[in-house]
UniProtKB/Swiss-Prot annotation:
This is Copal-8-ol diphosphate hydratase TPSSA3, chloroplastic. It comes from Salvia sclarea (Clary sage). The keyword Transmembrane helix does not apply. The gene is LPS. Mg(2+) binds at residues 372, 374. It comes from the Eukaryota. The lineage of its organism: Eukaryota, Viridiplantae, Streptophyta, Embryophyta, Tracheophyta.
Length: 785
């Protein structure tokens, strides 16, 4: 097997594979030739197909040394056309999925379907009110005699099977199906011993004894009524009921409303005052069915009819899920790096969330009189991120007297995923939002304690990668996270349709866990990466052509600069912006190095008419000065007169400060932001706008401090972020200026440029070289499969 140096791949490359060891071992020879830094190491394999695509692009295009930046972005090949077509098909599918979301898609719950099947005709006939539920049960028994999700969990299978057997027996239907179900329970009940308690379905210990009693009353034979484990479950139920104040269920909406069918004798009419606006009790079809059976309430009936409409005759475990499905869909699309394709749909979703938002937060479905920290945290974060006005003090509703945060009132054991979403929400903090500071400390410590024990406690979702996801999230705070780095990792963590959610039964959420999302994200990631690799070839040749090494610029530094640009603005069509970002960063360092180290003085007049007039105090530097001037000319080449005028102005301002010895990391950051904004079409008047000036000033201060932290190696991290009170306050102020809509003259995208640039400086200060090397290869060189 032949080793291939991708960074210097010839135009006619053959299908060969980079031979790489498991982690950090093979060296990139082009980078290794740098005299200033250690070689960059690889940690992944690059497929032959990926190499051939780069070669195909390169052969099809003009030679990279002669091609303009625009030429690079316009290259088309048969493979690229095919990928683009697949991407467009996937986008169309997802758009349709999102825009037809309605009350949210969710799989059928055999348990809830069985409870509804028990309802007798409300007009008094000896018939079921909902015969479709019985039909669904009859047609969905698994081969082993059980009912439940394909992901095996004995809690899910036992409860679903017991309920379905009782439902069929109550109408004396399908004795053969009943017999198979009874046999399954009898032969598998022992598996409850030692089963993972974290996978126990919600309310399991409350409803299993209830259905065992119903089975006894119906005369169902051979069920393991006297099995020690069944008796143990019954004892647990009695103990729980003793701990619940007798009248609590009638006083206020609590999680008890979720399992009313398992609570025994209740004053059912008293419960109606706690009914949600849609007629449900905590969005639970089975709990609502129990109330309907005892009250014949019309609103309960209407709710159940609605819940059955889109489930093929069965019922979901919760309905509606409009809030849950919308928030998590947006989150998944963003983290997978494909949200840009669905901006209209995302706004449509968030408008809906804003319209149903309550002062006490939200739950999985609208109008429930109940809220949880999971949905509320996700809502706070996404609404803030997209410029909606939302008060984070809503999270105080979940703060207990001892300072701890709880998923909801009455929660006995906290799970990892809600606290992780609280932590993520708390990182988008504006000045003065004390509740988010408290939430950050609590959630970080809560999750860190779980990680130290090497075991997460999770009751709501079964995900193979949740541990790794949370571990990474605590190591990589939002300020130090770049979009493409996040996508590269989340593609490893996201299971698509493989995620299983835990309610009264196991369930799936197509708008959240969807294989098409992942397929689209992989296609898009690899398409972007292929484009980035072509641009990286261009950057290497630019490095050699402009003799950047003579200015102290290492090849490693070049790669790092390009990586920061590509990991932030990654879209294939934004080649010019990426290259401008990377080259601006490099050129500013070249000029600073030339002026400060060699002692040379450069003189440029305001209008740049005298750009070619370079006066050198050292004759031997004339060659370098000429190279520097030519490189600067190349950077500005190709822009229209209006854009060129603005670029020269901001560069002139920056240059004067460098010559006066006032250059800094902050000034470099503002130069970069100004250059990117101008090339994006910024109106010259905006440069002097008060809001724009405030953004520039904050960015300067923040990035100057971050550069000092990086240069002086004084990094201290507390609760997942850099320990520097003033820096934290300034970052919060910048985030507020960027995210909060105030009707000002500065466009949101322009504001975001300052935050994006600042985050790259934060990234540089926060992550060590080894971590950055890994990120570089995940983003630029490791194809996703």
């Amino acid at each position: 097997m032949t080793s291939v140096n991708l960074s210097r791949a010839p135009a006619a490359i053959t299908r060969r594979r980079l031979q790489l060891q498991p982690e950090f071992h093979a060296e990139c020879s082009w980078l290794k030739s740098s005299s200033k830094h250690a070689p960059l190491t690889l940690s992944c394999q690059i497929r032959p197909k990926q190499l051939s695509q780069i070669a195909e692009l390169r052969v099809t295009s003009l030679d990279a040394s002669q091609a303009s930046e625009k030429d690079i972005s316009l290259v088309q090949t048969p493979h690229k056309v095919e990928v683009n077509e697949k991407i467009e098909e996937s986008i169309e599918y997802v758009q349709n999925l999102l825009m037809t979301s309605g009350d949210g898609r969710i799989s059928v719950s055999p348990y809830d379907t069985a409870v509804i099947a028990l309802i007798k005709d409300l007009k008094g006939r000896d018939a079921p009110q909902f015969p479709s539920c019985l039909e669904w049960i009859a047609h969905h028994q698994l081969a082993d005699g059980s009912w439940g999700d394909e992901f095996f969990c004995i809690y899910d299978r036992i409860l679903n099977t017991l309920a379905c057997v009782v439902a069929l027996k109550s109408w004396n239907l399908h004795s053969d199906i009943i017999e198979k179900g009874v046999t399954y329970i009898k032969e598998n009940v022992h598996k409850l011993k030692g089963a993972n308690v974290e996978h126990r379905t919600a309310g399991f210990e409350l409803v299993v004894p209830t259905f065992m009693q119903m089975a006894t009353d119906l005369g169902i034979q051979d069920l393991p009524y006297d099995h020690p484990l069944i008796k143990e479950i019954a004892d647990t139920k009695q103990q729980r009921l003793k701990e619940i104040p007798k009248d609590l269920v009638y006083q206020m909406p609590t999680n008890l409303l979720y399992s009313l069918e398992g609570l025994g004798d209740l004053e059912w009419e008293r419960l109606l005052k706690l009914q949600s606006g849609n007629g449900s009790f905590l969005t639970s079809p089975s709990s609502t069915a129990a109330v309907l059976m005892h009250t014949k309430d019309e609103k309960c009936l209407k709710y159940i009819e609605n819940a059955l409409k889109n489930c093929d005759g069965g019922a979901p475990h919760t309905y509606p899920v409009d809030i849950f499905s919308r928030l998590w869909a947006i989150d998944r699309l963003q983290r997978l790096g494909i949200s840009r394709f669905f901006q209209h749909e995302i706004k449509y979703f968030l408008d809906h969330i804003e319209s149903v938002w309550e002062e006490t937060g939200v739950f999985s479905g609208r109008y429930t009189k109940f809220s949880d920290i999971d949905d509320t945290s996700m809502g706070v974060r996404l609404l803030k991120m997209h410029g909606y006005d939302v008060d984070p003090n809503v999270l105080k509703h979940f703060k207990q007297q001892d300072g701890k945060f709880s998923c909801y009132i009455g929660q006995s054991v906290e799970s990892a995923s809600p606290m992780y979403n609280l932590y993520r929400a708390a990182q988008l903090r504006f000045p003065g939002e004390e509740v988010l500071e408290e939430a950050t400390k609590f959630a970080f410590n809560f999750l860190q304690e779980m990680l130290v024990k090497d075991r997460l406690q999770e009751r709501w979702v079964i995900s193979d990668h949740l541990f790794d996801e949370i571990k990474l999230g605590l190591k990589m705070p939002w300020y130090a996270t770049l979009p493409r780095v996040e996508a590269a990792y989340y593609l490893d963590h996201y299971a698509g349709s493989g995620d299983v959610w835990i309610g009264k039964s196991f369930y799936r959420m197509p708008e959240i866990s969807n294989d098409t999302y992942k397929e689209l994200a992989i296609l898009d990631f690899n398409r972007c990466q292929t484009q980035h690799q072509l641009e990286w070839i261009h950057m290497q040749e630019w490095y050699d052509r402009c003799s950047l090494s003579e200015f102290g610029i290492s090849k490693r530094e070049l790669l790092r600069s390009y990586f920061l640009a590509a990991a932030t603005i990654f879209e294939p069509e934004r080649t010019q912006e990426r290259l401008l970002w990377a080259k601006t960063r490099i050129l500013s360092k070249m000029i600073t190095s030339f002026v400060n180290i060699s002692g040379t003085t450069l003189s440029l007049d305001y209008n740049f008419n005298g750009l070619d007039e370079i006066i050198s105090s050292a004759n031997e530097d004339q060659g370098l000065a000429g190279t520097l001037l030519a490189t600067f000319h190349q950077l500005l080449d190709g822009f229209d007169i209006y854009t060129l005028h603005q670029l020269k102005h901001v560069w002139s301002q920056w240059f004067m400060k460098v010559q006066q010895g006032e250059g800094s990391g902050g000034e470099d950051a503002v130069l970069l932001a100004n250059t990117l904004n101008i090339c994006a079409g910024l109106n010259e008047d905006v440069l002097s706008n008060n809001e724009y000036t405030a953004l520039s000033t904050l960015t300067n201060k923040i990035c100057n401090r971050l550069a000092q932290i990086q240069d002086n190696k004084i990094l201290q991290v507390v609760d997942g972020s850099i320990k520097d009170k003033e820096l934290e306050q300034d970052m919060q102020a910048l985030v507020k200026l960027v995210l909060q809509e105030n009707g000002g003259a500065v466009d949101r995208n322009i504001r975001h440029t300052f935050l994006s640039v600042s985050k790259t400086f934060y990234y540089d200060a926060y992550h060590d070289d080894e971590t950055t090397d890994l990120h570089i290869f995940k983003v630029l060189f490791r194809p996703v499969v």
